[in-house]
Every structure is written in C-alpha cells, then in structure tokens.
Amino acid sequence: MQHDDTIAAIATPLGQGGIGIIRISGPASLEVLRALFRPSSSRFGGFRPWTLHHGTITDGCDPLDDVLAVHMPGPRTFTGEDVSEIHCHGGSGVLAAVLEACVRHGARYAERGEFTRRAFLNGRMDLTQAEAVAEMIAAPSREGMRLAQAKLDGLLGQRVGALRARLDALRMQLCVAVDFPEEEVECLAPEAFLAEIEAVRQGVVELSAGYARTRCWQDGALVVLAGQVNAGKSSLMNALLGRRRAIVTDLPGTTRDFIEEPLNLSGLAIRLADTAGLRETGDIVEQEGVRMSRDLVAQADLVLLVTDATQGLQGPELELLRHAGPERVLVVFNKTDLLEGRILPSAPEGCRSVHVAAASGDGVESLVTAIRAAVLAATGAGEPEAGELAPNMRQAAALDKAATILDELAGDIRAHVPYDLCGVRLDGACAALMDVTGQSTPEAILDAIFASFCIGK
C-alpha cells in the first residue's frame, strides 16, 4: 500500500443525515479542494488554514452541492499530513458524487483504516492509540468509552514505554559486561539484576491482567438464553428488552434460529441471544437451530439456563449445567406465577439462581441485577477503577510473551548463563514490548489491525 499519495473517503456513517463529511489527506489535498470548490463570497482570497469557507462543489460545469470546506496543513492534523474536508449534505448520493469528483481530480479511494494508519506511520500516535480509535468507535458503553479514551490519551503506551526503558537500562549493563570483560566495569550484582527483572515482569503481568478484568466492558459480554422448548426463553428476552423482539407461542420449537440484541445493564453492555430449545427433533431446520444453540452456549460468557418452575430442572438441563459449568450459568426458574402456592424450586448447590415470571414481569428487575453480577463473576471482571488500563487481546498476548521471556531470563541468571545469551533473552522481551506500541510490529500484523477499521477513519 502506498502511503505518500493523496487519499479520500467518506468520514461519516452512510445513510440519510443532515451533514456528511468527505476527508482528503495527502500532499495534493489542497489542490483537489481548489479544483472542486467555488466560493460563495466575492471576497474569498483563498483557503485560510483551519477556517470554514462556504461555497459550492462543482464537477466541471455541474454543481454538486452547497458545502462548507476547510483546509488544515500538516503536521498538526490527525494524519500528520495536509488534510482537507468537505462538509456537505448527508445523503448517500451526494456523498458518493463528491467523493467520485475528488478521485477524478487526483485523490484515490482510501483503504480501511488508512487515515489512522498514516497517523501511526507519521508518528502522530503509537499503535495502542491507533487501535483505541477503533475501540472508541465500537465502545458499547460509557465505561468502554472511558477505557478507550485512556489509551487514546497514550497512557497504556506510556506505561509500556516506562517498563521497556527499565529493560533498556539492563541491556546497557549487559552490553558493557560483554563488550569490556577485561575492564572491571561495574555490572549489576545478580541479586539486584534479578530483583529488577522480577519487578518489570510483575509490572508487565499486571498490565496484561487488565485485559481479562475489562474485556466485557470493552467488547460486551455474550449472554445466551438456553433451555428446553417452551421454558419461556423468548418471553424472557422480550421482558429484558422491554419490547417484543422474539416470537412467542405455545407451540414447542417456535424459535429455530438464534436472535441477538444489545442490552445495557447499568453501564455493562451485553449481547443477549435467544436460542432454539434443546430437544431431539426430526425437523432438519430445528436440528440446525439446536446445533447453533449448543455452539453459542460453548461461546457464552454467561448462560441463562431457563427452566419451567413448575417442572424444575430436568435431565437435559442438568446435562447442560454440567457441560457449561456452574460458574458460567445462572439458572432462571421461569413461570413462577403458575406455581399456585407451591414451594419455589432451587438449583443444585453452588449454582446461582433467580425466580421470575416473564409473562407478568415479576422478578425481571432482580434478574437484571443477577445477570450483571453473574457476568462480572464469570468473566473475572470488576467495576473499572479510575486509571484502569485495558489492553486488547493482541496487546495482552504481546505482554504475556514479554512476561514469559523475562521469567526464562530470571532462570538463566540463576543458572549463571553467560551474559551474551542473557542479552538475547532481554532483546526478545524488549521486542515483545515494542510490539505492543507498534515499534517493531510486522507489516502483515499492521494490515490485519487496520483492516478491521471502517473506511474513512
């Protein structure tokens, strides 16, 4: 991919809207804008930097739209390059026509994430900040936004950089000891060297653990409604959503495909999935639905095992509980309004449970509280603390690699392995930390990261 030409893309969501923005970045961004823009004021004397100008975008003799346009010279822009923006009406046809005109006058269509990639390549941000751009856009809750903002502010990159600086100091000590063995140059004593390695390793481990602690706040948790047919899973989904989303009938097997909807539980975003009832069936379509249900149960952060309170837990439900594990299951005894004074059923020892009547709404508020607590317990998450840093999966994997290498290095030091071989280990740990911030990340990895971005960002 070329990174020194001029690119253009629609920077706002597609669809109908009041305003849409075309972003142009690169050395010819001002020339492209000049070729298309016709000012509405006779006093227009050219584009003053960082100033909106009113006019018309024309393609040849054809006026395309009434717009506001701005030019922002680099390097103090998002990409670090010269950037121009055209603010036009937000219809998809208007935006497409203006973008095509930009391409005809010297720009090319931007690839996914190419604006942010250029910001990274031009030193405007490190890789943790670049990834945080996509995380902020996709954040499912206010807490997810706050965690992404901390990375956008560079806090994760700064913490990793501080740890790497401590390793660099150790590398210098080893280099001196290896390069000047005949000189009695003071090197860290093994005990002090080990103590510093362990201190850095502990810092790396603590950072990596932030992924597990915050994953459900960053990405949202998958909560799956599962159980036998006619247990009331779809009624429960509708009750939780506060609207009719799933079809509810008295016929067994009404739900054949899974339905997934987002739900915010006091700041904790979840993806709530209603699945086909678990039973043996000769219907091919329903069989596929049951197979998908089992797959979703295997992937779920939390399984809501919905059972008919008048029947109690049956064999298939107990098997699902055993298979999923009690730590990932919240047993929901539904239809308690039909018990008619009978004793409320209970779950096996060690299992969380709650009683509801989805049809009337009784107990749904308690269920919401129970789901939130169960998700946090099942994922090992907690309420995010002030200053919490939240690495993503890729960053956590690189941190884990660094911690493993440092552990091996400590073993080498204890075994009196020669300093030059210890230096190789130390180089590997530094490289793993550099992967976190993108200082040594292979091009193929960068391609994969930025391919997940939207076009225009």
Curated annotation (Swiss-Prot):
Name assigned to this protein: tRNA modification GTPase MnmE
GO cellular component assignments: cytosol
Binding site for K(+): N230, T249, L251, T254
Family stated for the protein in its record: Belongs to the TRAFAC class TrmE-Era-EngA-EngB-Septin-like GTPase superfamily. TrmE GTPase family.
Residues involved in Mg(2+) binding: S234, T255
Source organism: Nitratidesulfovibrio vulgaris (strain DP4) (Desulfovibrio vulgaris)
Quaternary organization: Homodimer. Heterotetramer of two MnmE and two MnmG subunits.
A GO biological process held by the record: tRNA wobble uridine modification
Gene name of the record: mnmE
